Amino acid sequence: MVSLSSLGRRHSSVIQMTLVALFVSATKLAGVLVTVTVAANAFSYNRFRKKFLHPFRSPIDESSDILAAFNVNPTTDGENEFFFGLATAPAHVEDRLNDAWLQFAEESPCDKSESPEHLQPADALMGSATADGGSQQASLSNKEGNRTVKKKKPLKIAMEAMVRGFEKYIEEEEPAPNDECHHNVAAWHNVPNPEERLRFWSDPDTELKLAKDTGVRVFRMGIDWTRIMPVEPINGLKEAVNYAALERYQRIINRVHLYGMKVMLTLFHHSLPPWAGEYGGWKLEKTVDYFLDFTRLVFDRVSDMVDYWVTFNEPHVFVTLTYCAGAWPGGNPDMLEVATSALPTGVFKQAMHWIAIAHSKAYDYIHAQSSASSNPIVGVAHHVSFMRPYGLFDVAAVTVANSLTLFPLVDSISDKLDFIGINYYGQEVICGAGLKLVETDEYSESGRGVYPDGLYRMLLQFHERYKHLNVPFIITENGVSDETDLIRRPYLLEHLLAVYAAMIKGVPVLGYMFWTISDNWEWADGYGPKFGLVAVDRANNLARIPRPSYHLFSKVVTTGKITRQERTRAWNELYRAAREKKSRSFYRAVNKHGLMYAGGLDEPIQRPYVERDWRFGHYEMEGLQDPLSCLLRFLLRPFSIKRKVKHQTDDAELVLQPLELSLE
């Protein structure tokens, strides 16, 4: 007869064996899942690499003394003329403008007296094509004393991450009162006369003369919607329109022509009237009707003076930063809107839909009201950046971001375009829910990776997709924030070489607009990043000081040529600074994991110049940089084909750091 104790031991043994079997099975299943996940991501990356990262042979003849020759002075009627231009925007340059940006900048989160339990966490941020930045967490009220409270603080992340609806919070100890206050707009409250911007409204001639003296043939400017319609036209346009302001714009546009330049006019450039922001702006259909009223007013007044029309500048950037992140004025999304922003029914696609409708209606009106002889040229300025994954598991994030931002807008309005405007500033390396700062890459002051090859790749991609439309491209914005001017000069030349190479490959590009003339207010980054060919002394009556890049740009514009000598000289100066371990300003905070915060800084940190060859056609992709990929690359290195890259130069001083290229 079996004892109860024996039965108990046997039962216990069976349970243990069962648990062990379950554990082993679970471990195997986990191993299979991990293997499948890694394999799937590796397969996805391999496809991505072949499609977007494949090496290409530059069509530029680098042995020639003349590397590029744009046809700025056609000798026969059949030749296509290439134009150069300079670009700016009302919110960047106009004084006496009580727009949403001024109100946003003047708001002081430090003045709010809220108890900790009522404090709302600031929205996470996204980097933007032209300039990154936005709101920060407000400090606690004074009545909290000096005690420390524990609260949630937003971990600011990148635009492409926020498009996908991510928001992260970290728990941390934070001193309650009297801390440094972070404003909605960085580097704004700590500079002289920030509200004056560049006084383009009261004194347009200073900027116009600087532009004219470079030799450019096109001047891109905008008309501010808020200035024309300071109040919502609920009771009709008569009581809502500032006709005197409209007349003033007409005189400014006439001044552009008197300086011998054509006009490219932008109707919406990241500045929504405050009254529209109060009711929801581009989330609602009635904004389409209001925008069409604005378009009619502008067109009816200045149509005979405008050569190119840009209805919208970078609409997906505006929608993302305003309605998905709340980092720009006029959005104020709640947590549900943020979390669902990238869904098919989310606020991103909702707002983009109404903007596409608004563009189409404006396009139809401009063409319908134009005479047959005037033949208006209407398009959009579409922001593109070259995105690549940092690690093996970031390919999906890049794919999703591209699917939302790269082609959908142009697809939706493709039959209502006379040209496709491309705004390109650089590359972005996606890591999880943020942008990774790659130590071996060069960056602008505002955190944009310098990558001229990306412009070439983007132009070829867009041409392949839209060549059936038979519409040309215009580079409506390209530039770099660089106060030292050492990066800007090679940046300018290399991106123009990228454009020229694309034209050799058959991409029809009509012109190139550089951003921008003088250092100005860069959205939520304030006056931190310096994008101008001309420096501005804000403490000395906004005195202008042309940088060396101003004269280089002028030379390229007037001759239409890029020479090997000019290229070598620009690179010598940059690499001398890199070899001497010099540093320059950087207006983007970076956390311990190397992720860039999207918010700007009131005062810059210092970052060294990077000794890397990013000339057009010379940049070498280093492969994935996450620990797993680096380990695999290290293990496979003995079996890889390696070659040392030697860089030829006419100047013995220019010695570039060789990179190893591993075939993966």
Segments (PLM) and residue ranges:
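Non-catalytic scaffold segments within catalytic domains of secreted glycoside hydrolases
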Residues: 41-217, 228-663
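Short hydrophobic transmembrane-like helices used for membrane targeting/insertion
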Residues: 2, 14-15, 24, 32, ...
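Terminal signal-anchor or tail-anchor transmembrane helices
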Residues: 16-47, 635
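Short, low-complexity, Lys/Arg-enriched N-terminal segments of secretory-pathway carbohydrate enzymes
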Residues: 1-19
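Accessory DNA-binding and partner-docking regions appended to nucleic-acid-acting proteins
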Residues: 221
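Leucine-biased recognition of intrinsically disordered, low-complexity hydrophobic segments
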Residues: 4-7, 29, 33, 140, ...
